[in-house]
Amino acid sequence: MLTRNGQRLINSRNWTELVKPEVLDKDPSSTETFGRFVCEPLERGFGTTLGNALRRVLLSSLQGAAIVAARIEGVQHEFSTIPGVIEDVTEIILNLKQVRLAMATDEPQRLTLLAKEKGEVRASAIQGNHNVSVLSEDVLIATLSEDRDFRIDLEVRMGKGYVPADMHEGLESEIGLILLDASFSPVKKVAYTIEQARVGQMTNYDKLVLEVTTDGSIAPEDAISYSAKILKDQLTVFINFDEKESEAEKNRRRDDIELNPSLFKSIDELELSVRATNCLKSANIQTVGELMQKTEHEMLKTKNFGKKSFEEIRRVLEDMGLEFGMRIENFDQKYQEWLKRKQTDEA
């Protein structure tokens, strides 16, 4: 284990030197229930890693509402038929499973479906309350072949994933009460593709394109956000160090950096190839201090600056105990002060 003065050192370069996505762009074609999102640039392979993980969580782990039990007036069990109703009870139950709902509470809610007139009975006949709203009002529940009273009492709950009828807590099968298999997930479909992304002259980075379709109870961007939070919380247990230690080490290194005499060197003093030197000059980088404050991403975006030049410069910085992405407060001011001292000494 790497230590300094008996203290453990955290090598933050393992994650700070990776290219990070700049923004999650939402496509203009997105709607309240469909979202197309583009995330770039990502290190090669990270598109598949993140896309697959997000897809699994989106489909399996988000909370949603579903009907878990139904009591149809005059019906004893799900294999019954109802006079004056074209569909049998089994068909009605299958139709109820298609109803999508939005709930504003974690407490179970009771709803009622009422109809009297001949014709189609759709989910819009379900009487919601201030805690529950019906999203899929066009779903056909049953068809009345004559005028008659038709009533279904429903129980709605929040949950996640798929729960079989016999697994609902606190509900037991009894005469007249029909338990339903419930699919709680508010996310209906997730697809992702990986394309090439460009960083400077390099094209071997990933672009993650994520398409999410929901039932309307949650916005696609919120679904992604919640899923990312779930993944973040689950991965925390694998981090075996306090990130404050990492910050402390970063501060110690910053103190070392500010004492480093190489900071004020001109890039002309470095043993770099002509191509690398010219690239730095074209980016208006004159000193080592200016150079090391650039991130890998910023460097690779520089015109005509490729991976080979980047690796060459990175090795030179390492030889001086420096690296990309470091920060020095008021570097320009310190550089000017150093120049004045140098001119005074030379005079």
Curated annotation (Swiss-Prot):
EC number(s) per entry: 2.7.7.6
SUPFAM superfamilies noted in UniProt: C-terminal domain of RNA polymerase alpha subunit, Insert subdomain of RNA polymerase alpha subunit, RBP11-like subunits of RNA polymerase
GO molecular function: DNA binding; DNA-directed RNA polymerase activity; protein dimerization activity
SMART domains in alphabetical order: RPOLD
Keyword Transferase appears in the UniProt entry: yes
Disulfide bonds: none
Region (Alpha N-terminal domain (alpha-NTD)), start-end ranges: 1-242
InterPro entries on file: DNA-dir_RNA_pol_insert, DNA-dir_RNA_pol_RpoA/D/Rpb3, DNA-dir_RpoA, RBP11-like, RNAP_asu_C, RNApol_insert_sf
Keyword Disulfide bond: no
Reactions it catalyzes: RNA(n) + a ribonucleoside 5'-triphosphate = RNA(n+1) + diphosphate
One Pfam family recorded for the sequence: RNA_pol_A_bac
GO BP: DNA-templated transcription
Keyword annotations: DNA-directed RNA polymerase, Nucleotidyltransferase, Transcription, Transferase
Main enzyme class: transferase
GO cellular component: a single term: cytoplasm
Location of region: Alpha C-terminal domain (alpha-CTD): 259-347
Domain description: The N-terminal domain is essential for RNAP assembly and basal transcription, whereas the C-terminal domain is involved in interaction with transcriptional regulators and with upstream promoter elements.
Subunit structure: Homodimer. The RNAP catalytic core consists of 2 alpha, 1 beta, 1 beta' and 1 omega subunit. When a sigma factor is associated with the core the holoenzyme is formed, which can initiate transcription.
NCBIfam families the UniProt entry points to: PRK05182.1-2, PRK05182.2-5, rpoA
Purpose: DNA-dependent RNA polymerase catalyzes the transcription of DNA into RNA using the four ribonucleoside triphosphates as substrates.
Similarity field: Belongs to the RNA polymerase alpha chain family.
Protein name, per record: DNA-directed RNA polymerase subunit alpha
Species this protein is from: Solidesulfovibrio magneticus (strain ATCC 700980 / DSM 13731 / RS-1) (Desulfovibrio magneticus)
Gene: rpoA
